Amino acid sequence: MVKKEVKKEKEIGKVIHYFDKAMVAVIKLSGGLKIGDTVKFVYNESEFIQPVESMEVEHKKVKSGKSKDEVAIKVNKETHEHAVVYKIA
């Protein structure tokens, strides 16, 4: 019997603004997030997964964000305001 690896997801924030031309999502964090983490964006029936490759707070590059921070990350696909963001472990 082959064991299937179960990936854990933890809600870490919500998209509060999306810049469609730049493809940047601003996330209000409810948990920690750092460069290299894998995140999943979920909005209605659509979802996608991507690694966090860059992050900014107040237009300054940062390596991590904590609860209550508003961080901007570049996204690979279109998302929407109010999308829920999960960190995948």
Which role does the model predict for each range below?
Residues 2-29, 33-89:
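Beta-strand/loop-dominated core regions that host nucleotide or nucleotide-derived cofactor-binding catalytic loops
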